[in-house]
C-alpha cells in the first residue's frame, strides 16, 4: 500500500495541497495512552508554514482535529484519525502549471504514471502530505518516551556550503529551536539565515543537510536482513519530499578509513556493554547496539523557484516557466520535525515488533 507505512504501528496519510483537507489514520496505537490535541498541535506548529521570514508565507494554522480513536483523553486501540483543513489556498497561482511541468518537480512523473495530476501546489506530491506524518509521529514519540525514555533530536547542520562545526554534545530542544533555521550553533545559524534570505531575493532556493540523533534506544531493535533498522530509517527519510541522500554513522566518509580505524571497540561501563567510538551510528547488523543512533539526510534545493526555467508543456512543446505562488526558499527549517516524526515511526514499529517476537521492551 503506497500510502501506508509501518507493520504494527501503521500510518496511512491522505489528502492534497489544495484539497479540502489532509490527514492520517494511525492503526495499531496501544489503548489507554493518555493523549491530547495539544500534544499533536505542538509538533504541527513546528512544521507549519508562515512561522518565519525564511519559509513560505502561506498562512495555515494547521489546527488538528481528532476524529476517532480517542475517548475521554485516552486512546481506545481502534484506528485513530486526525485531520487538518486546508485554508489559505490560491489555485490561480498554479494555472500555468496545468500546462507546463516544473523542472525537477513531481509534475511530469505523476503525469507519466497516472495520466492525470492535481497541478495545484503539487497535489499529493506537496509537502503538506507530511502533516499526517508529523501528527502520527507525535504519538509515536510519546510512546517511546513513556516506554523507554527515548529522545529524538534533529537539527540543521548544513545549508549549501555553510556547515556547523562538529557537535559532540546532544543538543537540547531549546538550542535547536533558538533560531528559525533550527541549527544549534548560533554563529552558523546566523550565516545560514543570511544565505537563505539572499537566495530568496534572487527568486532561487538552496538545500542542505539535517542530522538526527537518538539516545536511549536499547540494544536489540531491528531485524537482521531485509528490515534492518538502518534500512527502514533510510526508506523513511528518502520517502520525504526533496530528499536525495541518507547516511548513518560514518557514512560515506567511513570509506576512507581502515578497519582498525573504523571498528568500534566494546567495553564494559556501569555493568553494560558499550563502545568507545560510534562509527556504526548505533546500528550493527541491522540491529541497534545501545549507542546513540546518528544519521544524516540530504535535501535538495526547492524545485519550485521564481526564475524562468526551460521546460516542456503537456503537448510536448519546448517552453519556459517562471513559477508563481508561495514556496520555501529552503525546506530544511520545516523538515526538522518531519525527520523526527519519521524516526519515531520507525522506532516505535520496531519496538512493537521486538515486543511481539521476543516479549521484551513492553509498553
From Swiss-Prot:
Cofactor(s) needed by this chain: FMNH2
Record has Flavoprotein as a keyword: yes
Residues spanning the membrane: none
Binding site for NADP(+): 47
Binding residues annotated for FMN, in chain numbering: 124-126, 285, 300-304, 326
UniProt KW keywords: Amino-acid biosynthesis, Aromatic amino acid biosynthesis, FAD, Flavoprotein, FMN, Lyase, NADP
Assigned EC number: 4.2.3.5
Family annotation (PROSITE patterns): CHORISMATE_SYNTHASE_1 (PS00787), CHORISMATE_SYNTHASE_2 (PS00788), CHORISMATE_SYNTHASE_3 (PS00789)
Molecular function GO labels: chorismate synthase activity; FMN binding
Biological processes annotated in GO: amino acid biosynthetic process; aromatic amino acid family biosynthetic process; chorismate biosynthetic process
Pfam families (UniProt xref): Chorismate_synt
Enzyme class, broadest EC rank: lyase
The reaction(s) this protein catalyses: 5-O-(1-carboxyvinyl)-3-phosphoshikimate = chorismate + phosphate
InterPro entries: Chorismate_synth, Chorismate_synth_AroC_sf, Chorismate_synthase_CS
Subunit structure, interactors included: Homotetramer.
Function: This reaction introduces a second double bond into the aromatic ring system.
Name of this protein: Chorismate synthase
Source taxonomy: Bacteria, Pseudomonadati, Verrucomicrobiota, Opitutia, Opitutales
Amino acid at each position: 500500500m503506497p500510502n501506508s507505512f509501518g507493520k504494527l504501528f501503521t500510518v496511512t496519510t491522505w489528502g492534497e495541497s489544495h484539497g479540502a483537507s489532509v490527514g492520517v489514520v494511525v492503526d495499531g496505537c496501544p489503548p489507554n495512552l493518555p493523549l491530547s490535541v495539544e500534544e499533536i498541535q505542538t509538533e504541527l506548529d513546528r512544521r507549519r508554514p508562515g512561522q518565519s521570514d525564511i519559509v513560505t508565507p502561506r498562512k495555515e494554522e494547521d489546527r488538528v482535529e481528532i476524529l476517532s480513536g480517542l475517548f475521554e483523553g485516552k486512546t481506545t486501540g481502534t484506528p485513530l484519525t486526525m485531520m487538518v483543513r486546508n485554508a489559505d489556498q490560491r489555485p490561480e497561482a498554479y494555472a500555468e502549471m496545468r500546462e507546463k511541468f516544473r523542472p525537477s518537480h513531481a509534475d511530469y512523473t505523476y503525469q507519466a504514471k497516472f495520466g492525470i495530476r492535481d497541478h495545484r501546489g503539487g497535489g499529493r506530491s506537496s509537502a503538506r502530505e507530511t502533516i499526517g506524518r508529523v501528527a502520527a509521529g507525535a504519538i509515536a514519540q510519546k510512546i517511546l518516551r513513556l516506554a523507554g525514555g527515548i529522545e529524538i533530536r534533529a537539527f540543521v547542520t548544513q545549508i549549501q556550503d555553510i556547515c556547523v562545526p562538529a557537535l559532540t554534545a546532544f543538543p537540547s530542544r531549546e538550542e535547536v529551536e533558538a533560531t528559525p533555521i533550527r541549527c544549534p550553533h548560533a554563529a552558523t545559524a546566523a550565516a545560514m539565515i543570511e544565505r537563505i534570505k539572499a537566495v530568496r531575493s534572487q527568486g532561487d532556493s538552496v538545500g542542505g543537510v539535517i542530522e538526527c540523533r537518538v539516545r536511549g534506544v536499547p540494544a536489540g531493535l531491528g531485524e537482521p536482513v531485509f528490515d534492518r533498522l538502518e534500512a527502514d530509517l533510510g526508506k523513511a527519510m528518502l520517502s520525504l519530499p526533496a530528499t536525495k541522500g541518507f547516511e548513518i554513522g560514518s557514512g560515506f566518509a567511513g570509506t576512507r578509513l581502515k578497519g582498525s580505524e573504523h571498528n568500534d571497540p566494546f567495553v564494559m561501563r556501569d555493568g553494560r556493554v558499550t563502545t568507545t567510538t560510534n562509527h556504526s551510528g548505533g546500528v550493527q547488523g541491522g540491529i541497534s547496539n545501545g549507542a546513540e543512533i546518528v544519521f544524516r539526510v540530504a535535501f535538495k534545493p526547492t524545485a519550485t523557484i521564481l526564475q524562468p526555467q526551460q521546460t516542456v508543456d503537456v503537448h510536448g512543446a519546448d517552453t519556459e516557466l517562471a513559477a508563481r505562488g508561495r514556496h520555501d526558499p529552503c525546506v530544511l527549517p520545516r523538515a526538522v520535525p518531519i525527520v523526527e516524526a519519521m524516526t519515531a515511526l520507525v522506532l516505535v514499529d520496531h519496538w512493537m515488533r521486538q515486543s511481539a517476537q521476543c516479549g521484551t521492551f513492553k509498553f
